[in-house]
Each structure stands twice: as structure tokens, then as C-alpha cells.
Amino acid sequence: DITINELGQLTPDSYILLDMRGDVEVGHGIIPGAIHMSKEEILEKYSGGLVKADEAEAAEREDSAEKKLIIYCARGRISQELAEALRDRGYDAYSLKGGYTSWLLNEMKNQQADEVCAQVEKSIRKKFRKNIWCKFTKAINQYELVKEGDCIAVCISGGKDSMLMAKLFQELKLHNKFPFEVKFVVMDPGYSPENRKVIEENARKLKIPIHIFESDIFESVYHIEKSPCYLCARMRRGYLYNFAKELGCNKIALGHHYDDVIETILMGMLYGAQIQTMMPKLHSTNFEGMELIRPLYLIREDDIKAWRDYNDLRFIQCACKFTDTCTTCNNEENQSKRVEIKQLIAEIKKKNPYVEAHIFKSVENVNIETVIAYKKDGVKHHFLDNYDL
């Protein structure tokens, strides 16, 4: 292993930094200067054989052989095995101790809370006013998400979406056109100490007063072979409803954004044979008097990423037990489908720049008279039911 401090003492031209995490994790942040490659790509590129390579490739491999290869994963566990395999091939290879999380915590130590928070809040009011703040308030008003007397549990997972949502609610409270309360809730379903510290540090830095409660959800789903991520999400929502109710809240706010909505619409059609959407708000079926709201409903994911990067913020993505020991967590069936849908939309957008807006609007323009069948309150209605009336 090589530590973060030891890495910092090396000159940039003396090593090659390789990020072996999944595409989704890398999308949430990468160590500057790192090259993103899968385990298979790394093993293929650094095969150790120069005989069959062309001149350019051979030269690159010879250059690599003279440099340290430093590999990192999420928390420095699975990268150890890969580093060992590369050492067996003759490379001077190391695993970054603690992985990306270790680097992230080290970066956060050097940031001053007052300065960071002030910049973040200013960016919401100024630079991102149009694309983030105005779309947030539009969703609040258009879908009547916040009402007088509400007590809202803003649910923070530790990612970019929920952290932004928390800051937007703090800004909304400053305007406070009518009285309502917010509580910032973090559920620890079994985070590693390092990941919990990342969440706590970000909350401290952004001056978000969080309520943390613990559960054993990660332990409960760890040995589930089929769709553990789906079961985990369902269980987490139930725990959040319950804790929010204990705090006196009547609503929970989740950080789903515009892109989540349009991807859900297409996934339902292409994989579920149904037309449905992710609603901006809904009543809980299991917790009487509770509602779920999605205030980021109109905000684009690229704008959230731009806000994150502009403020040099670093957040966790998935911090479950699976990412400690498994490289395929992000390839879980449902996640891979969502990635596939993202790619499909991006491909269509090359020819039709309005495709995203059209998908979003499609569920607002459903004509019941032109569908074969539909369901209402669990009852299926067919066009033939009233055809001859």
C-alpha cells in the first residue's frame, strides 16, 4: 500500500494514477490526474509483454514500467489484489491505502467551513440562480410541495443531490413567505466509519444541522443475492418515514431530479411495459398522514454536477457494504438499465435536441381516449368497456 501522504510526496511525473471504480462512482468525483480504467482494461493494458505491441504501444509500456502504478478503488480493498497482480508482471504497482474515500477525507480537512458555505450559498443565489434556484422554487409552487404549517424531513444520503436540496431548503427558509419547518435527516444504514465521516464533514462544512439515526439495513440485505439495491432502497424509505414521523414531520423530501424522472418514464415503457412517471409528490400508503415530495423535480443533473464542481465539493455515491468488496455493485441489473437508458437518451438527443423535454411532457399529455387500457385506483379499465355505449 501507499498512503495519501506518501502519494503527495511523489512528483507527478513519477507515477501513473489509475481509478478502477465503476462509471457511476467516477461520475461523482475522481482524484485529479487519475485515469479511469476498469480492472480488465488495466490488466490488458499492462500485460507485461512488449513483443507483439506496435512501436507506440511498446514505448508507452516501457514508460509505464519506469513509473509507479498506483491503483485505487472506493476504499482501498479490491485494488490491493490488482496491484499484486501487476507486481507479479514486473510493474512497480501499489494500492492507495483507504482508496478514494481516504483522499476525499484528506481534501476536506483543508477546507474552511465558513468560506466554503458562504461560496456555496452565493453560487445558488447568483451563478446558478436560473438553472437551480428558480427551478427549485418553480417546482415548489407548481406542484404545491410546501404548504403553511408543514414540517419537512429533508433526507440526506450524502450525495450531491440531497446535499444541494438541503442548501436550497435553507435558502427557502430565509424567504419564508409562510411558516414551515425543516429538519435535516441522515440515516446511517451501516456506513463504514470513513463514509459516515465524509457525510458529517460535508454537513459541517455546509452548515447543515443534521439529525443522524442508525439502522442495520446494510447488514439485512448483505446476503440477499437478487436485487439487494432495490430491497435496500425500499427499506430505507420505510425507516425514513418512521423517523420523520417521530420528529413531528408530515413530509419527507427526496433528491430525485429531472433526469431521474425521464429515465424512469422510459424504463417503465421499455422494461416494464407500462406508462408511468416518478411523481413530484405522493401520499404514503403505509404511514398515515405522511407525504413524499421531490423538490429537485425540474432541475437537470448536469446543472447539479456543475454546481458541485464550481464549489469544489466532494460527495459520496454508494457507501454500502457491497462496494467494500465488490466491483459489480454498480452493474446491478436495475442500475445497468438506468445507465443504458441514459445512453439511449443521449444518442437520440444528437438528432433531436428536444427529446428530454418531450419525454418529460409525454406523461402530461396522455389522452385516455387513445389508449387501449389504463388503471385507476388499482382497477383496470379497457376501451371496450364503454365502446358501444
Kindly give the residue locations of the regions a language model identified.
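The feature marks non-catalytic terminal segments
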Residues: 313-389
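ATP-dependent adenylation/nucleotidyltransferase module used to activate substrates
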Residues: 112-267, 271-275, 279, 302-303, ...
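A short acidic, helix-capping loop that chelates divalent metal ions and anchors anionic groups
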Residues: 26-27, 104, 219-225, 326-327
